[in-house]
Amino acid sequence: MSSPTITVVGAGLAGSEAALAAAKLGVRVRLFEMRPQKMTPAHRTANFAELVCSTSLGGEGEMQSKGLLQAEMRSVGAAIVTSADASRVPAGNALAVDRDAFSAHVTEQVKNHPLIEVVEGEVETVPDGICVIASGPLTADALASDLRRLTGSERLSFYDAAAPVIDVDSIDMDIAWRAGRYDQSADYINCPFTKEEYLAFFEALETARSHTPHDWEKLEFFEGCMPIEEIARRGVDTPRFGPMSPKGLDDPKTGRWPYAVAQLRQEDAEGRMWSLVGFQTGLKWGDQKAVVQLIPGLHNADIVRYGVMHRNTYLNAPEVLDSTLQLRADPQKLVAGVLAGTEGYLESSATGWLAGTNAARLALGLEPLTPPAESMLGGLVRYLASANPKGFQPMNVNWALVPELPTEINEKTGKPKKLGKREKRPPLFRRGLGAFMAWAGQDAGVPVTPPAVPEHPQDELPAIR
């Protein structure tokens, strides 16, 4: 008897994860990807799961909400996190990867799987039968229009951007230095500004922004991947209280925090390419170079990849999705990734894993499932299905998505004990991971292996990509 077959549209992070998750359950998959026949404004290769913005999948460890989601995905052997682990580069307490090695690793897994058939070409209408739609933030107009018809929902969009990448040999290390915040690592290159240098940089950034064709007042951005020029538009000090914050970075020449700092993070395993952290941009390339070379230590910067800005597309998830990621209008259709209203690589891949697992269960005659509320994936998909649809915007994981710990009463005062982050988060992490693994092994019926958990005592990392 032949295995049942499902369709997956899109071979990004969510689609690749969905295809591999379904195939792991013994279901055949037809995976459609329009690249390289039709490229997007943001992609540059034909590889699957190409990272078009940052190379970070977020902070690790018990203090991090993304750390819990990483651990959940590691426990079920999810492809994106295991590929990230196999291609990781030094990034302090974050899980960052070599961009090309990562996508090559995912592509190899997908193309070599005997149950996955890759079909090159654009999908213009929602396929018949059981299907995972993971066409991503750059969903082609024809498919987006058919999705709108199917769901009755207006298509929403926001703007996203990538940061410039610098050749390490062009960085002046007599000015810059390597360190992490509060000496937690030496995985970042830091470029220090005096007040005068910062104000000159800011003025050039403002002038460059005025050269772009964008009507900045009308563009919607997601806060976690906002262009540096849009951050600057909000005020002269906004960048240095955001991605250019000097907190925890002692300049070895002065022993003090600089007025502002531009940080660079390693992009590749060899350490030859470094991206400017939080410097996503849509500036014209000539202006980008001029602005970047005003950063102390980058006066001779060789930009090997310029930043770009593009539009992202997503559905109003609370109006159209159940927590199983099935469309309410057609339960045989599931949606994953940015299109489902998630923000972030890790979130996209995790919803891909759930959508692929549930699509396979449907094909096998089983009921689709929702992970427990205590788990980070369960909290995320419950939010997508139940948030206020008015003004809905994509969501990344955070601790507010999972239930609070049971309240303990202070015996002396008779009042509830107030717990700090360091007291609350490790128990939330352990509770969530335990609940997820029990659910995955018992209810979902997938193999589970307890993951190693990095012990990083720091607070939640800022949402800077």
UniProtKB/Swiss-Prot annotation:
InterPro entries: FAD/NAD-bd_sf, MnmG-rel, MnmG-rel_CS, MnmG_N, TrmFO. Keywords: Cytoplasm, FAD, Flavoprotein, Methyltransferase, NAD, NADP, Transferase, tRNA processing. GO terms for molecular function: flavin adenine dinucleotide binding; tRNA (uracil(54)-C5)-methyltransferase activity, 5,10-methylenetetrahydrofolate-dependent. One of its GO terms (cellular component) is cytosol. It catalyses: uridine(54) in tRNA + (6R)-5,10-methylene-5,6,7,8-tetrahydrofolate + NADH + H(+) = 5-methyluridine(54) in tRNA + (6S)-5,6,7,8-tetrahydrofolate + NAD(+); uridine(54) in tRNA + (6R)-5,10-methylene-5,6,7,8-tetrahydrofolate + NADPH + H(+) = 5-methyluridine(54) in tRNA + (6S)-5,6,7,8-tetrahydrofolate + NADP(+). Coiled coil: none annotated. Its cofactor is FAD. It comes from the Bacteria. GO terms for biological process: tRNA methylation; tRNA wobble uridine modification. Its EC number is 2.1.1.74. It is found in: Cytoplasm. FAD binds at G10, A11, G12, L13, A14, G15. Catalyzes the folate-dependent formation of 5-methyl-uridine at position 54 (M-5-U54) in all tRNAs. Belongs to the MnmG family. TrmFO subfamily. This is Methylenetetrahydrofolate--tRNA-(uracil-5-)-methyltransferase TrmFO.
